[in-house]
Amino acid sequence: MRYMCRTCDTESMKSSTRVTKGKIVLESSARLTPDTFPLKDWIPGRRRVPTQERSQRTRRQILSAAEALAKNEGVGNITMQMIAAKSKIAAGTAYQFFDDRDAIFAEIYEEWAVAFWATLNKATATPWSDATWRSELHGLITQMGKFYLESSSRWDIIRYVESTKQGRGAMRTLLDANISRFCDWAGPLFRARGYSAAECKAICGLLVRTIRGHWVYGVYTPQELRELSKTAEDGTTAIVEVKLTRASRPRTITGKSV
């Protein structure tokens, strides 16, 4: 499933802007509500999650065992038999919960994606304004960097899943949803400066990809976190400053937001 990426449309901006002496002025806006998690039914042949407590514990044992083995042995070396042995269950029992090893890894990926999405929504709850965009950007990078560091033990699994056909689709869906969230979060400031909806979407896409590029290989130590967070913030701040400066060029206003 592909997530339909929104543009920074005029309707969503009206409540946060006003026209004063021929200029669009950005006003404070209400906090954004969390967006719906964008991944649905992306895992082929997914088994129903059990409701009995004992079965839920067994399922969790399998996921934890797969995660530990992937960290210690490498994702490509793991088999269902190894996962079952680590879980202290019969191999046949493992197959009652998951079709194969990749189905287990996909479940771990989705757990990570759910946590990623919750962290992103929390960090992008307050739309940008002229006075707050720097602190908002700093807060986002700080929170996302911390998330990546805390989930570093899963990174080999995440990269593996995203190399598969289904995983590539899931990754693209998350990326599109991330850009859409940025359109709601950062977009009103750029729209108030006169950028079109398409231009706004392009800027938000550039910001998302710039930040994402700093985490693409994972974050494994606090030192890496500090270094990557600084370069991510420096790079995106420079982009925003350039875009806002260029937006100072005169634009015609005809009574409607442009």
Give residue spans per PLM region.
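Hydrophobic/aromatic-rich alpha-helical bundle segments in the mid-to-C-terminal region
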Residues: 189-236, 247-258
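Amphipathic alpha-helical packing segments from all-alpha helical-bundle domains
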Residues: 117-121, 146-150, 159, 166-191, ...
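Hydrophobic alpha-helical connector segments
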Residues: 107, 121-150, 203-204
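Helix-turn-helix
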Residues: 61, 69-103, 107
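Hydrophobic/aromatic residues within well-ordered alpha-helical segments
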Residues: 58, 101, 108, 112, ...
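Secondary-structure edge/capping motif, primarily at the C-terminal ends of alpha-helices
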Residues: 120-128, 155-165, 214-222
